[in-house]
Amino acid sequence: MAALRRLVSGCGRQLQAFLAGPAATGWLWLPARGLREVVKIQEGKTTVIEGRITETPKATPDPPNPSGQCPICRWNLKHKYTYEDVLLLSQFIRPYGGMLPRRVTGLCREEHRKIEECVKMAHRAGLLPNHRPQLPEGCLPKDKPKLNRYLTRWAPKSVKPIYKKGHRWNKVGMAVGSPLLKDNVCYSRRPLKMMH
């Protein structure tokens, strides 16, 4: 039985070497064809349609600001992203939702802190539902706690609401968002409010 197992494993190794070897590239992998442009030529009653090979574009386009010290500065995105830009944020997080370290992402300190804050806000808003650790089999997720409208660490039932926050023109505001994002570009007519 052991001899048969050795024979099968040896044949498997030889087959792998044959498939991965340089001779296999000719029939296993086809060469890249390049981009083709469809050209229509009419000569009298005949119409010839042919595909001419065009130059292939660059794999990665050049950034507008190549002297920037981090990817966000290089692409001029410094004050132009928020917690809602999930595609941008997902490049800097692990599959389970944690932030990648600065040495991996190549971000400067300021942008790393801003991205970290945006990732936290996106998690809280529920915009990154797939980026969380998977539960072991057989475990059921706990029910989400009800929203604590009073923003305190005590149970909402034990808290007395604040009925008077002041007159409308002099109300005590509630902090919303992050002060790190206060310099962001605002495209709406209303200015960005950090206190609601």
From Swiss-Prot:
Subcellular location: Mitochondrion
SUPFAM superfamilies to which the protein is assigned, alphabetical: Ribosomal protein S18 (SSF46911)
Pfam families: Ribosomal_S18
A single GO cellular-component term on record: mitochondrial inner membrane
Transit peptide boundaries: 1-34
Sections of the chain in a coiled coil: none
GO BP annotations, alphabetical order: mitochondrial translation
GO molecular-function term, one example from the UniProt record: structural constituent of ribosome
Main location: mitochondrion
Domain of life according to the entry: Eukaryota
UniProt keyword terms in alphabetical order: Mitochondrion, Ribonucleoprotein, Ribosomal protein, Transit peptide
InterPro entries (UniProt xref): Ribosomal_bS18, Ribosomal_bS18_sf
Cross-referenced Gene3D superfamilies: Ribosomal protein S18
Assembly notes: Component of the mitochondrial ribosome small subunit (28S) which comprises a 12S rRNA and about 30 distinct proteins.
Annotated family: Belongs to the bacterial ribosomal protein bS18 family. Mitochondrion-specific ribosomal protein mL66 subfamily.
Protein name stated in the entry: Large ribosomal subunit protein mL66
Taxonomic placement: Eukaryota, Metazoa, Chordata, Craniata, Vertebrata
